[in-house]
Regions:
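Extended acidic/polar alpha-helical scaffold segments
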Residues: 766-876
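Short loop/turn segments immediately following beta-strands, especially the blade-tip
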Residues: 124-132, 174-178, 218-235, 550-556, ...
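Loop/turn segments within WD40 beta-propeller blades
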Residues: 20-26, 62-68, 103-109, 146, ...
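A structural motif specific to WD40 beta-propellers
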Residues: 8, 47-49, 89-92, 131, ...
Length: 876
């Protein structure tokens, strides 16, 4: 099995903090998700996360106006990354030394303005015509504010820019010295000035402050007074004054109008201005936003879209779509104000997600979190498709039925619920005679029986899905039943593990109800069945993975994994680094689709992949590099330790004036492990609560502190040739294919493992030769050809040769069906699932087209019939 899994996408979280930004023609939205950047394509309805991480959560996002794929992100410490979102490549690193409250590219794309405390720094951006050693070169530093600078706005000609500050003023600077010009100060606000904007003709300036005031500034004098105000009779100064490009520099700006938003008990948090339409949108702490027409200051639209404050707002290029981000609730919204409809409405889990499960098609993932929500995510688009909120407590485990569109969830509220994924409703609720907390769940392969293990009475409950009645109560464990799973082969065996250091096998469908107990060296935390049902893997508290034969209960081996999962340090660790592995353990295990590997994750920042046969570690992935999470650093910095404790645990009150009254109140209880972890005095632990392999074997997912992380095989960068020789080259393969030797060319392309060449040779095979080539194909390459056919059959490949691919599939099954059936649960399982998924999606697409065509033909037929009857009546 290949282990070259790379980061693919991040689901479960759509927005955390910072500013949202539109790119391109306004159909792309950039949103900071922790220390990663998420990209949402609003036209194609897909999203993905960049594979690069900053050191801390992203604070600002800036998009180049000359190339919307060039995006600069900066974290809380001022460390920035310049990346190309189209190629998903990292171009440059940069450190601004201080937190950047705002970053803006100039309209010509040649300069980058960055807030630097009370100063503004302007940097020259990389240029293909000028070779420089550093990617960014400091052009000039601008001073004048007495408090932190909040925002920057450029003029259209990139010669001037406005800056706003906490000192309740805005200032106008010139990029380069202009004869006779001195920086201008705009005063008159009573609170911090959040934003300042130029009008389209740059004859008017608008400033917005936190207290809800909007001031309109314009020129008070004529052109003659502007020249007198310059006070310089030098020829260069006169030419600069008469230059229309310098109008904003020599105008005598004064307050022409004072307007107020009149929102009681609220403050302005963010604002955005669209110059071509002169529309101003403002977000408030109450979750309300309002749209105003400037300079008349007429209210166009007002709507409450969130229960908490709106943290960021952006307007697309056409001015039709408004993007909002709500930090506390993790909401991301795109609103079309003209039609009053949502273009995008996404929200992640409010607290951590505890569990996940893959559907049989591999394209749907369900997650359950501490907020009591069950969410379904599409792995292709990255969007949440439906949310179930019937549970009133944290979700402990979710499972799909192997057959049918049914989803089960177990919760600490004492219920197990079944959901119909066709009608999206909760059609069955299972409860115990006495209220208990369910912490584990298992579904029988036929989907007719569901079992749940409790944490307080140490019993396992079994219900019938059809009737909803309790069938049996399995007693025997002496601790919380932490994990349950049925034999996937359908033998009826139920495996369970508990804190009582045992693994039990229950024959639940036999009258005897015999049980068999196998001893562990420590408390059992998780277990998994191999897909063929011939082996069980159990994770225990001592950091071991134990393997058992479920047929006779014999132990097949023990794997010590404590050193593999340890390594992360917490800021309040009191033990030495060499003793840090004592509490490391896996809390979730899962077999690969072919059963050759085990994926494990737990209370550490790593997910490990082990080879079952050799009992060795194949690969280890680090989930996050976010320094604000505990467990991401291998060594602690002694410079961060003070007499009052670690600096990271001390509340920073420097920005308390920007918080609302509700945010300043600390409602956390001493010793509480759950609750609002957005408080700055708490540090979440980087860990993986649940890991699962995709049924296709091409990807795996982890429910981590950062969200739902998806890792997939990078087929484009993986070169895995077999049986090479000097004569085997791409040119020789193409020559054989053009000469008509299809089998030789296909085998050569398979041995070279070149995906582009393989598709070219495969689709050049003649239709009538497919059955013959399928019969002559060696058994060694059948799985690879099936994988190729499944990938080309998938509608996402945009291949028009549907009948050709179906003919290949039928011929392979006719020629090698017996061997495929024999190995269907092991080596061929991922390929068969991929083919089934492609066929199901193809069938759904064809059915949709046929239904639409049938409805259209019925409409035409009914119209013709009515017209014919009307003609008959007119004749009579």
């Amino acid at each position: 099995m290949k282990s070259s899994f790379e980061f693919s996408n991040l689901c479960g979280t759509v927005y955390q903090q910072g500013n949202v930004q539109f790119g391109g023609n306004g159909d792309t939205l950039y949103s900071p998700v922790g220390n990663r950047l998420a990209v949402f394509d609003l036209v194609r309805n897909v999203s993905f996360a960049m594979p690069f991480e900053t050191r801390k959560p992203i604070m600002r996002v800036a998009v180049s106006p000359k190339n919307s794929h060039l995006v600069l992100v900066a974290d809380e410490d001022g460390h920035a990354l310049l990346m190309n979102t189209a190629r998903r490549s990292l171009l440059a690193h940069m450190s601004f030394k201080l937190p950047a409250r705002d970053i803006q590219f100039s309209p010509d794309g040649r300069f980058l303005a960055v807030t630097h405390g009370t100063q503004v720094q302007v940097w020259r951006t990389p240029n293909v015509f000028v070779r420089e050693f550093a990617p960014f070169v400091l052009h000039r530093t601008y001073v004048g504010h007495s408090d932190d600078v909040i925002s920057i706005t450029w003029s259209k000609n990139s010669r001037f820019f406005l800056s706003t500050s906490k000192d309740m003023t805005a200032r106008l600077f010139s990029l380069d010295p202009v004869p006779g010009f001195r920086p201008k100060t705009f005063t008159g606000h009573r609170d911090a000035v959040l934003q300042a904007y130029f009008s389209l003709d740059e004859r008017t300036i608008y400033t917005v402050s936190r207290d809800g005031a909007c001031l309109t500034w314009s020129n008070k004098d004529s052109q003659e007074l502007m020249q007198e105000e310059s006070g310089d009779t030098d020829l260069g100064a006169t030419e600069a004054t008469n230059d229309p490009e310098n109008y904003v520099a020599f105008a005598r700006w004064g307050v022409m109008q004072r307007n107020y938003f009149h929102q009681a008990n609220t403050q302005v948090v963010c604002a955005a201005f669209h110059a071509p339409t002169s529309r101003l949108v403002v977000g408030f702490t109450s979750g309300l936003f309002s749209l105003w027409d400037m300079p008349d200051f007429q209210s166009i639209h007002a709507l409450s879209i969130s229960q908490d404050k709106i943290s960021s707002v952006a307007i697309n290029e056409s001015g039709e779509w408004l993007a909002f981000g709500a930090q506390r609730l993790g909401q991301l919204l795109v609103w079309e104000w003209a039609s009053e409809s949502y273009i995008l409405k996404q929200q992640g889990h409010f607290f951590d997600m505890n569990t996940l499960a893959y559907a049989q098609d591999g394209q749907t993932v369900v997650t359950g979190g501490d907020d009591g929500k069950v969410k379904l995510w599409n792995t292709v688009s990255g969007f949440c498709t439906v949310t179930f909120s019937e549970h009133s407590a944290a979700i402990s485990q979710v499972e799909f039925a192997k057959q049918g569109q049914v989803l089960f969830s177990a919760s600490l509220d004492g219920t197990v619920r079944a959901y119909d994924l066709v009608r999206y409703r909760n059609f069955r609720t299972f409860t115990s005679p006495n209220p208990v907390q369910f912490v584990s769940l298992a579904v029988e392969p036929s989907g007719e029986v569901v079992c749940a293990g409790s944490a307080d009475v140490f019993e396992t409950y079994m219900w019938s899905v059809q009737t909803g009645k309790l069938l049996d109560i399995l007693a025997g464990h002496e601790g919380p039943v932490t994990s349950l799973q049925f034999d996937p082969a359908g033998s009826g065996l139920l495996a369970s593990t508990s804190w009582d250091r045992t693994v039990r096998l229950w024959e639940v469908f036999k009258r005897s109800g015999a049980t068999e107990a196998m001893q562990l060296n420590a408390e059992g935390l998780a277990l998994a069945y191999r897909p063929d049902g011939h082996e069980i893997c159990v994770a225990s508290l001592d950091g071991h993975l134990s393997f058992f034969d479920p047929q006779n209960g014999a132990s097949r081996g023990v794997l010590d994994c404590r050193r593999d999962i340890s390594g992360g340090r917490s800021v309040n660790d009191k033990v030495a680094r060499r003793n840090n592995a004592a509490g490391a353990a896996f809390t979730s295990v899962c077999y690969s689709a072919d059963g050759s590997c085990v994926l494990a994750g737990g209370n550490a920042n790593y997910v490990c992949l082990y080879d079952v046969r050799e009992r060795v570690l194949l690969k280890r992935w680090k989930l996050s590099k976010n320094l604000l999470l505990d467990g991401t650093q291998d060594r602690l910095d002694s410079r961060q330790v003070t007499d009052a404790g670690n600096v990271a645990l001390i509340n920073d009150l420097s920005d308390e004036d920007e918080l609302t009254l509700a945010e300043r109140q600390d409602r956390s209880l001493p010793g509480a492990q759950r609750g609002d972890l957005s408080k700055r005095s708490t540090r979440p632990l980087a860990r993986a609560k649940c890991v699962r392999f995709s049924p296709t074997g091409q990807s795996w997912a982890a429910a981590s502190t950062s969200g739902l992380l998806l890792y997939a095989l990078d087929t484009g960068s993986t070169f895995d040739p077999t049986d090479l020789d000097m004569e085997l080259t791409p040119q020789s393969v193409r020559s054989a294919s053009l000469a008509g030797d299809a089998l030789l060319a296909l085998l050569g392309a398979l041995r070279l493992s070149d995906p582009i060449l393989l598709v070219e040779v495969y689709e050049r095979v003649k239709y009538q030769e497919v059955p013959l080539i399928a019969r002559q194909l060696p058994q060694l390459y059948v799985a690879e050809v099936l994988k190729l056919v499944a990938s080309r059959l998938d509608p996402s490949s945009e291949s028009p040769h549907v009948e050709f691919h179906l003919h290949w599939l039928s011929s392979l099954f006719n020629a090698h069906g017996e061997k495929i059936r024999e190995l269907g649960h092991s080596s061929y399982a991922p390929v068969l699932r991929a083919a089934q998924m492609a066929l199901n999606e193809l069938r759904a697409n064809i059915k949709t087209v046929c239904d639409e065509n049938t409805a259209a033909m019925l409409y035409v037929y009914n119209g013709l019939t009515a017209r014919h009857e009307q003609q008959i009546q007119d004749t009579l």
